[in-house]
C-alpha cells in the first residue's frame, strides 16, 4: 500500500514539473505601452517604456553624443487620437536641419510639427530626454510608417552635424528577429492596420 501511494505522489510531482516546463516555454509578452496623463492639458499620452536607441556608426569625440532616440506616441484628447513620432538628436548636431529617417533603406516622408509639444496640446515632451541638451523633433506619424518601423530590420536617422558632415544613427533589430517587438506591441495596442 505504501508503494502505491509513493508512485501516485511521484506521478503528481512529475506532472507538476512537466507543466512548469511547458509554461516556461511559452513566449513572454512584449513590453507594455505606458499611458500617462498630461497634468496641465488633460490629454492622455501613450508611449513606449523607453524610446528606441540609435547608435552612430563612427567615433564622433568624447564631448559629443553617440546616441539618438525615437519613439512613437499617441495623443488622446477627448477621444480624438493622433499619432506622432518624437526624435531626439545629440546636442552637437544641427538643430536647424530636419533629420531624414529611413525604414530599412527607404526614406520616410513625415510632416514636421515645427511648434513643438505645446502646439500639439502637451505641456511637456512625451519622453524624458536622455540628453537634456539634445534637439527634439516632432513628426506626424501614419499607420503605414509605424508598421514599416515595427517590421524593419534597420531604422536610421541622417542629419548633418554642426560642421555640415552627415551623421548616421542606426538601430538594428535583434539577430534572427524580424522587426522591433517594442514598436510592434505599440502598433498592435493602438489597432494599427497592416500588422
Stretches with model-predicted labels:
Residues 23-24:
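C-terminal motif of bacterial Sec signal peptides marking the signal peptidase cleavage site
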Residues 3-17:
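Bacterial N-terminal signal peptides that target proteins for export
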Residues 95-120:
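Extended low-complexity, serine/threonine- and proline-enriched intrinsically disordered segments
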Residues 44, 107-109, 165-166:
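Short, solvent-exposed loop/turn motifs
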